[in-house]
From Swiss-Prot:
CDD domains: ExoVII_LU_OBF. The lineage of its organism: Bacteria, Pseudomonadati, Pseudomonadota, Alphaproteobacteria, Hyphomicrobiales. GO terms for cellular component: cytoplasm; exodeoxyribonuclease VII complex. Heterooligomer composed of large and small subunits. Belongs to the XseA family. Bidirectionally degrades single-stranded DNA into large acid-insoluble oligonucleotides, which are then degraded further into small acid-soluble oligonucleotides. This is Exodeoxyribonuclease 7 large subunit. The keyword tRNA-binding does not apply. It comes from Bartonella henselae (strain ATCC 49882 / DSM 28221 / CCUG 30454 / Houston 1).
Amino acid sequence: MNLFFEKTGATNVAEFSVSEIAGALKRVVEEKFGYVRVRGEISGYRGAHASGHAYFALKDDKARLEAVIWRGIMEKLKFPPEEGMEVIAVGKLTTYPGSSKYQIVIEALEPTGVGALMTLLENRKKKFAEEGLFDEEKKKPLPYMPKIIGVVTSPTGAVIRDIIHRISDRFPLHILVWPVRVQGETSGREVAAAVKGFNVLPLEGLIPKPDLLIVARGGGSLEDLWGFNDEVVVRAVYESSLPVISAVGHETDWTLIDYVADWRAPTPTAAAEKAVPVKIDLEVYVVSLGARLRTGLARYFDFHQQKLRAIIRALPTADQLFALPRRGFDEISSRLERALCVSCDKKRLYFHTLAIRFTPRLLNTEKAQHSAKEYTARLHRAFVHIVEKQRAQLEIAFRLLKSTSYQNILERGFVLALGQNNKPIKRLAQIPEKEQINLRFFDGEISVITQESFFNRSSKSKRIKSKQDDQGTLF
């Protein structure tokens, strides 16, 4: 071994420990290069570590450079790193003595151009569309009058002030704000967590569950709005059971959350206007509905009142109802009376004839007496039969007369109005003004004085005690 060092002349070379060599290399690299700009493709990115730091590599077709982004820098990035994204990294070269590796500590990271971000955005959009996340039939309808609105946005800035102001002007209601970062590496995860958080709130909890969500942010560049293109945001909105309105950027700005949301507003102010109706317009509409209802009811009652009057005019009067039965009763009564008289006359004549034919001699005989008694009994039975038959016919006629009597009509709740000389009043026009008329009920009569005109008539009645004081109302 000594011979080897003597032959190579290495005996005079300074001796270093491994740590000294690693430290020397670290100083040389850091002093020689300082800040550098490196273009490469992100490789091996698996998201931020639990500590908040990110570890990955930058590569091209010939080499590979390890990279690290500390937590403080990650939170300030305008867009999150993506696997396969071509970027320009700005940072310092250094070495890691523990594994004899050199790496770049990135302090700024940006894509190589907007075209790269647009390509990535289109690829994501195509992927989600193929999964059906943007299908119109899967979008939920917005509630017309929500009671509570949840807003996911930055707690500071003009966006939240515009939303609160616009909702308060149109239809004041309860607003819940879930504060999040709307720009930077963690913005997408915070927005997704807020949407999921609103969905899991209990309906009757201390913090009530909203009926509608608004995810809002002001305008900005593609890099500024990149957090709303995150996959976690798109899937959180798609899985939300609450309707979501997206209001990210200006009218010309489009992010993936706009495609998956149930309604896309061009601005945060437009989102507030879509979320609630105008209270004054609702009040005017309710008043108009009330007027239409009153008009409809008036027409309905007027139509049926006219129909009822037509039916009343078509009904027959009391005289018309009783005329035919009364005539039939009179005819039957007259025929019955004549029949009884004729029958009695015939029997009387027959008895008189028999009395002449009988002699005292015949009557004194036992046979004649027996025959006379028998004949008398038969005659009596025949007469009784005739009388009973006529009585039955008379009772039938009386019941028929009673069934058609106006007194029965009065017992069913009708009233007979009588004017002067107890003549029936058939029409309203026959009622004299400020005159006395009689109203006949089934159990008595009362006298009333007419006071008002034909169209507004009220009667002040002076009751006459009837035989029964406990008569009920007719209606």
